[in-house]
């Protein structure tokens, strides 16, 4: 999956299945399970312009995000009503405001030194955005990037041949394979997707709590 795919998606606003108009219900319900307190820094990979960031900031957390599309990052700050400071940091463009840093560029080129320390990860739309071969690269990269910070992870599961993706189906056994060596992987919630995924096929969402092994 090439970067041009996602740039085109944002240019044409084809972000169904990823962007929600309000904070994710699983985030609101389960974020207190993570061992972090207000003031902690939360990493949101492949963040787009998610409203989850506004919710996290409103709860007193600091947020770092990574996003490929400059359009998405600019729309995020516009919707937050914040004018960012824009600088170049390593291979990325950094958009900064009080309590918020978004690194625009390839997440696989993001380094721990550039990102800085984080205390937790909220992954609702990153792992599922990637095809299987890229998920096998992404998971260990995220673990190294965040120094095995605890994660709250949401994955779709559906009959993959019925829908090309993204978002892709990530069945529970794959989640355990990807993260089981580094984390205690606990399933904490599951729910059907109302109306099906993109209205095309039945799907469920699985919520996982990943804590250091």
From Swiss-Prot:
Endpoints of the signal sequence: none
Gene Ontology CC annotation, any one: cytoplasm
Main location (coarse class): cytoplasm
Pfam families, A to Z: TPMT (PF05724)
GO-annotated biological processes: methylation; response to metal ion
InterPro entries given in the database record: SAM-dependent_MTases_sf, Thiopur_S-MeTfrase_Se/Te_detox, Thiopurine_S-MeTrfase, TPMT
Enzyme class: transferase
E.C. numbers: 2.1.1.67
Molecular function (Gene Ontology), one example: thiopurine S-methyltransferase activity
Keyword DNA repair carried by entry: no
Superkingdom as given in the UniProt entry: Bacteria
Amino-acid positions noted as binding S-adenosyl-L-methionine in the UniProt annotation, renumbered to this chain: 10, 46, 67, 124
Protein location: Cytoplasm
Entry's transmembrane regions: none
Family, per entry: Belongs to the class I-like SAM-binding methyltransferase superfamily. TPMT family.
Full protein name: Thiopurine S-methyltransferase
